[in-house]
């Protein structure tokens, strides 16, 4: 659906998430469940958490780090799998892209990528990754072949992105520090040119709403901007 224009967001509620979430990264929402990736920088561990969406109750947790690759990022899912990038904690570092079962969180398969993949979206034809600060896009086949790489024409630093409504929906920041603006961008999936942009504010803790995880499902925008105690913000989207 090229040319989609987002014209209104209404905050419906926020859901406190149970337990220590460390430094949150990406989210995925489906079937009454919420999945969250997170990194414990002190212990050098990566985490995948599963929650009951309605209540924020934690259901399961799995460690995802592999060697020096401890930093999971923004991620996505298909019908039965979660596709999660877990990278070395530095620009240009290697990444292992893991395919994990939504039913059990167990690792099903994986492949390595020669760059730090900080966000990953599942497309019908493969996997779209964005590197550190989203300066480049990389496209992989589902069996791990790097098919192409190209520069991101947008200045935003995307943390999480999904293929929704025929576009790439990417959430992140424009600018840095106190001047950073929270944005959700709709990108053309072939050219990555901007179709639409919605600018959001900050939480009552002063954190930009798109600081970390994002998903868009059934007319609802889900944002997880804050580390522990983490809150999932739910917005109604009106087109």
Each language-model region and where it sits:
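Blade-loop segments of beta-propeller domains
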Residues: 56-86
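Repeated scaffold domains used in trafficking and secretory/extracellular systems
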Residues: 21-28, 67-76, 113-124, 154-164, ...
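A short beta-strand motif characteristic of beta-propeller blades
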Residues: 11-18, 57-65, 106-111, 145-151, ...
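Beta-strand-rich domains and repeat architectures in extracellular enzymes and scaffolds
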Residues: 15-46, 71-74
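Short loop/turn segments immediately following the C-termini of beta-strands
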Residues: 39-41, 87-89, 132-134, 173-176, ...
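Structural motif
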Residues: 43-49, 91-98, 135-140, 177-186, ...
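Loop/turn-rich, solvent-exposed surfaces of beta-rich toroidal or solenoidal domains
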Residues: 153-189
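Short loop/turn segments that connect beta-strands within beta-propeller blades
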Residues: 52-56, 100-105, 141-145, 188-192, ...
């Amino acid at each position: 659906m090229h040319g989609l224009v987002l014209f209104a967001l209404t905050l419906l509620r926020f859901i406190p998430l149970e337990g220590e979430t460390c430094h949150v990264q990406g989210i995925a929402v489906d079937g009454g469940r919420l999945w969250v990736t997170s990194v414990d920088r002190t212990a050098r561990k990566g985490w995948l958490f599963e929650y009951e969406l309605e209540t924020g109750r934690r259901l399961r947790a799995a460690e995802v780090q592999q060697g020096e690759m401890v930093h999971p990022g923004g991620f996505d899912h298909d019908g039965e799998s979660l596709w999660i990038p877990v990278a070395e904690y530095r620009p240009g570092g290697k990444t292992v892209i893991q395919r994990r079962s939504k039913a059990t969180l167990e690792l099903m398969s994986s492949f390595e990528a020669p760059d730090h993949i900080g966000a990953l979206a599942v497309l019908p034809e493969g996997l779209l990754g964005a590197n550190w600060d989203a300066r480049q896009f990389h496209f992989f086949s589902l069996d791990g072949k790097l098919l192409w790489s190209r520069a991101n024409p947008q200045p935003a630093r995307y943390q999480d992105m999904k293929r929704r409504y025929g576009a790439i929906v990417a959430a992140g920041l424009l600018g840095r520090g106190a001047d950073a603006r929270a944005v959700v961008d709709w990108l053309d999936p072939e050219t990555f040119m901007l179709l639409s942009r919605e600018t959001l504010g900050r939480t009552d803790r002063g954190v930009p709403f798109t600081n970390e995880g994002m998903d868009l499902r059934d007319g609802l925008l889900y944002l997880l901007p804050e580390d522990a105690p983490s809150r999932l913000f739910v917005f109604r989207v009106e087109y």
